[in-house]
Amino acid sequence: EKTSEFDKWLRKLNDLRAKAKILLRIQKLEKDEHFGDCEPVGDGIRELKINYAKGYRVYFKEIDGKVIILLIGGDKSTQQKDIEKAKDIWKKIKK
């Protein structure tokens, strides 16, 4: 599952190679649940790092080792803002 914010971010991403790498990484998550380079950022939200170009990030909520929702994406330059946005999105969803 993914949010409209995540869809919007991915649609606006102009770097097609980066978009392909991000989608492939998400697909791997869905198939074998191997998170790879990933860290908790608070409130049960995790940051998936895609080490390519700008250092893309995907923020998601995970329960019992399974990704349940893709919240938002960004890159290294907007990391702190994206983490706060992901937390806000999650708070709205769980209400």
Stretches with model-predicted labels:
Residues R57-K61:
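Short beta-strand motif preference
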Residues E1-K54, D64-I68, K76-K95:
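Basic, Lys/Arg-enriched alpha-helical interface segments
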